[in-house]
């Protein structure tokens, strides 16, 4: 097990994806009007390993239309925060436009937050990092 300089366990990429599969809520960090923005999103893993989001007309859709490089983050911890984990995935955000991919996306149980969240976008991670926090020793 690798430990970083802050004493946190560094997770292997497969561990990161296993943890992401246990959650449905994360955050996307993107650039909006030349400023950083962090927005909550529901997500699911797509068949090819990418992350799938269902969004409405807003900053995330605009970022996907521009093919922006974004950072996604999800985490979890117990109520005392004695044990927690965090996973980040960095990559290009794109709109799912291919008919075959859209059919696959529709088959995934990704409940939208609103009736206007009807566009699928996906993040193909190029860099995946994770850390696990816990008691030392």
Regions inferred by a protein language model and the residue ranges of each:
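Short beta-strand segments
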Residues: 23-56
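Short hydrophobic/aromatic-rich beta-strand segments that constitute the beta-sheet cores
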Residues: 52-54, 72, 130
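A structural signal for short, well-ordered beta-strand segments
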Residues: 43, 89-93, 123-125
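Short, active-site-adjacent segments that bind or coordinate small-molecule cofactors and metal centers
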Residues: 108-137
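Short, structured beta-strand-loop surface elements
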Residues: 57-118
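Short, surface-exposed beta-strand-loop junctions and turns on beta-sheet-rich folds
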Residues: 34, 59-61, 137
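Extreme N-terminal tail/first-helix region
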Residues: 1-21
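Structural motif
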Residues: 49-50, 69, 92, 127
């Amino acid at each position: 097990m690798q430990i970083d300089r802050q004493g946190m366990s560094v997770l292997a990429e497969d561990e990161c994806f296993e943890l992401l599969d246990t959650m449905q809520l994360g955050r996307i960090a993107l650039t909006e009007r030349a400023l950083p923005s962090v927005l909550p999103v529901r997500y699911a893993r797509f068949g090819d390993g990418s992350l799938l989001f269902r969004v409405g007309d807003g900053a995330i859709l605009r970022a996907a239309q521009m093919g922006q490089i974004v950072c996604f983050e999800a985490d979890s911890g117990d109520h005392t925060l004695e044990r927690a984990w965090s996973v980040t995935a960095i990559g290009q955000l794109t709109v799912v436009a291919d008919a075959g991919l859209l059919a696959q996306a529709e088959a995934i149980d990704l409940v939208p937050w609103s009736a206007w969240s009807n566009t699928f976008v996906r993040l193909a991670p190029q860099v995946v990092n994770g850390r696990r926090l816990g008691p030392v020793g």
